[in-house]
Amino acid sequence: RSRAQDGDDIYVSGTIGDGVLGLRALTGLLSGLSAPARDHLIARYRVPEPRLGLGLKLIGLATACIDVSDGLIADLGHICENSKVSARITAASVPVSAPARTALASDPGLFATLLSGGDDYELLFTAPSGARDAVAVAVNEAGIAVARIGAITRAEAEAGVEITDAEALGIDLKTAGFKHFKD
């Protein structure tokens, strides 16, 4: 968690937000989904799929890696704090499942919940931008979808996470449950 460097790419495996949406569905806080969509989200919450194979492929390649248990933004914040860097991500690049997209279509305000909720147990990792081909090979060998969502930047004052398109996506950073730092 402590070797991310300025210029590293930020990646996440699988999809983000299914865990927290599954919990919301179980507790009656999410409605308007088809039974299969609801079942998918609940299953992702109840039985997360750890990405052990991918983690093994990333040994010696990733500069920092953490599972997304506290929420994408919080866990990226842990990498930043431990590595004494900042991060800049594009929320629109964060991979979201089809059931989660359906939920977002009826309530776009849920995007902040997807980014700050937890229990996805996907891998969030950094790797040098010059290692994109090696990352692609590792991802292909592991058979897990991975998305590049941003880059590590030098921390100007305090380590933190910036979401470049938060306002355009209607993400209310004040209520998203995480600290937001700008360069």
PLM feature spans:
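Glycine-/charge-enriched secondary-structure boundary and capping motifs
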Residues: 60-61, 65-183
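Short, acidic (Asp/Glu-rich) active-site segment that either coordinates a divalent metal cofactor
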Residues: 1-56
